[in-house]
Amino acid sequence: MKTEIQEIVTRLDQQSNKGEGGESMKWLFRPLLQMLAGGESVTIEDMATTTGKPVEEVKKVLQSLPSVEIDEQGRVVGLGLTLIPTPHHFTVDGKQLYAWCALDTLIFPALIGRSVNIESPCHSTGEPIRLNVEPDHIVSVEPSTAVVSIVTPDDMSSIRTAFCNEVHFFSSPNAAEDWLDQHPGGKVLSVEDAFELGRLMGTRYEESRPANGSCCDI
């Protein structure tokens, strides 16, 4: 299974580098998630300050992202982690946030460095699936038989359309059978294996550092 997970990571990384945001996501994504985890929309100026990038560069990257969610004031309200309700409830430090897909809920605790409670319906039966996830491990999963669907699309120019919209929780492998029949190239992973997949995928994103480069920037 470790080999299979690594193959999925390699495939998704290759497509992500050519897809939405490309290499820019490596410096933008993690700091943006950490700011969104505070439960408030994020300004371009705040992103520039946090990443140490010029405002115009941040603005240009955001304008190139077809999936990013921006409010009427031009502030970011969602990119993977979102303030806009989805089926994937993501509660961090008492704040109710949401994620675009099942795998996001498993990737983001490590990227934001927080313990998270997750609730999401089985895509087939509607049965609630509840998890408590720490940055480095899964504390609990109910039901224990839950699995996560995974796809590896060729075109990631819109990550939400191509990937996120097909990545769901199912209450059991049996509950995912119809989805697998409809997605011949798809797979289902145990929650533990999906967490490991997410951990490996998350390593492509840089740690945020102060804009003045004073910490560990030698």
Curated annotation (Swiss-Prot):
Enzyme class: lyase
InterPro entries: MerB, MerB_HTH_dom, MerB_lyase_sf, WH_DNA-bd_sf
Record-level GO BP terms: response to mercury ion
UniProt-listed Enzyme Commission number(s): 4.99.1.2
UniProt keywords, alphabetically: Lyase, Mercuric resistance, Mercury, Transposable element
GO molecular function list: alkylmercury lyase activity
One Pfam family of this chain: MerB
Catalyzed chemical reaction(s): an alkylmercury + H(+) = an alkane + Hg(2+)
Function comment: Cleaves the carbon-mercury bond of organomercurials such as phenylmercuric acetate. One product is Hg(2+), which is subsequently detoxified by the mercuric reductase.
Record family assignment: Belongs to the MerB family.
Protein name: Alkylmercury lyase
Organism: Bacillus cereus
